Amino acid sequence: MEKNAAAEIATTADKTRLISPFAETVGSLAVEAMLYEVTCTPSPGLVDRVNSGAHTDMDFYSFMSSSAALSICMTRCVQAGLNHGGTLPALLPVLRRIGIDGEARMLQATGGVNTQKGLLFSLGIVAAAVGWLQHTRNRQDSGSILQCVAAMTAGIVTRELGNMDKSVTSLTAGEKLYRLHGVTGIRGEMEQGLPAVLEHGLPTLRQAMADHLTVNSALLQTLLVLMTVVDDTTVMNRHHP
């Protein structure tokens, strides 16, 4: 049964290689968001145009390379949502399959450096939610999109972090922080429907743009607000909590 299920997931993921114009449009917006993130300068503790922050193995150009490599993956995530006729939790294994391919592309582009695996996970799921809403309801708004994200990832913290039997030395950074400090990281944010984005990030960004700030200033203001409410496990790990 598991073998058949895996084959079905692989077939479903492969179907996303046939891309619709809608998926191309949303996928390009996802890549634009990825590029905007790294061009926001200064970004304390993070990679930006002039500094690598807490990172010693990557820089601005690493992110340019990986963003380009992940572009097709983002489009395929949108297409996966458009194609999906089942429940939202059933879409997640398909996205994981696409994500594995995306991660391989990213690592090849960066010489083996993990620049945007977390963003591949989070933004890929958001992109798929947009596709699913277009297919099922012909609508997209931030609240509905993030409700879909929560439904798609329901129970992910317990499944992936709550039942670990690994030794501490074999844990990933996120797993170690959860075991030692109870930090749920991006999985917890996704399972809750990215509340920091909905309640803090988006209102701040929209107000900044309404106040006619430059794009960089608006992004920086949004970043600083998010830093007050989000636990960044990457920065926490690289600064040895």
Pin down the residues of each PLM region.
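Phosphate-rich cofactor/ligand-interacting catalytic cores and adjacent structured alpha/beta frameworks
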Residues: 1-85, 92, 130-241
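Long, hydrophobic/aromatic-enriched structural stretches that serve as scaffold segments
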Residues: 74-132
